UniProtKB/Swiss-Prot annotation:
Propeptide: 16-22
Cofactor (UniProt): Ca(2+)
Organism: Oryctolagus cuniculus
GO BP of this protein: arachidonate secretion; fatty acid biosynthetic process; lipid catabolic process; phosphatidylglycerol metabolic process; positive regulation of fibroblast proliferation; positive regulation of podocyte apoptotic process
SMART domains: PA2c
Residues where Ca(2+) binds: Y50, G52, G54, D71
UniProt GO molecular function: bile acid binding; calcium ion binding; calcium-dependent phospholipase A2 activity; phospholipid binding; signaling receptor binding
The protein's name: Phospholipase A2
GO cellular component: extracellular region
Reactions the enzyme catalyzes: a 1,2-diacyl-sn-glycero-3-phosphocholine + H2O = a 1-acyl-sn-glycero-3-phosphocholine + a fatty acid + H(+); 1,2-ditetradecanoyl-sn-glycero-3-phosphocholine + H2O = 1-tetradecanoyl-sn-glycero-3-phosphocholine + tetradecanoate + H(+); 1,2-dihexadecanoyl-sn-glycero-3-phosphocholine + H2O = 1-hexadecanoyl-sn-glycero-3-phosphocholine + hexadecanoate + H(+); 1-hexadecanoyl-2-(9Z-octadecenoyl)-sn-glycero-3-phosphocholine + H2O = 1-hexadecanoyl-sn-glycero-3-phosphocholine + (9Z)-octadecenoate + H(+)
Length: 144
């Protein structure tokens, strides 16, 4: 639920200010690239113990483990001196990437923080595309 509120606020803020999409929306685009026809926020937010904002417990399956790894990657990004908390944090910093077929490529023109975040998102999107989706794990809270 918190993630959906955050997504709604980011959408409103982005639309109102006319700025480029934030990393969350770019992550959505990467998932749609690797899994054409998917609805990432509807399908993955609230899946397992780690997909969505926050996470705890033991991942329920390999797809949930993708989310746990993505969370850990963002934690590492926040430790970089180039990823400041307010401006260049993983949830709001935009980056450049391209999609060709189902292949995502991060731009070599990204700065250090942008490149790190882009790679976190790219690896997670690829991971999602290679793991089965188990409907019984959406939504889930009793195992976390």
């Amino acid at each position: 639920m918190k993630f959906l509120v955050l997504a709604a606020l980011l959408t409103a803020g982005t639309a109102a200010s006319g700025v480029s999409p934030t990393a969350l929306w770019q992550f959505r685009g990467m998932i749609q690239c690797t899994i054409p026809g998917s609805s990432p926020y509807l399908e993955f937010n609230g899946y397992g113990c780690y997909c969505g904002l926050g996470g705890s417990g033991t991942p329920v399956d390999e797809l949930d483990r993708c989310c746990q790894t993505h969370d850990q990657c963002y934690t590492q990004a926040k430790k970089l001196s180039s990823c400041s908390f307010l401006v260049d944090n993983p949830y709001t910093n935009s980056y450049s990437y391209s999609c060709s077929g189902t292949t995502v490529t991060c731009s070599s023109k990204n700065k250090e923080c942008e490149a790190f975040i882009c790679d976190c998102d790219r690896k997670a999107a690829i991971c999602f595309s290679k793991r089965p989706y188990n409907k019984e794990y959406k939504p889930i809270s009793k195992y976390c």
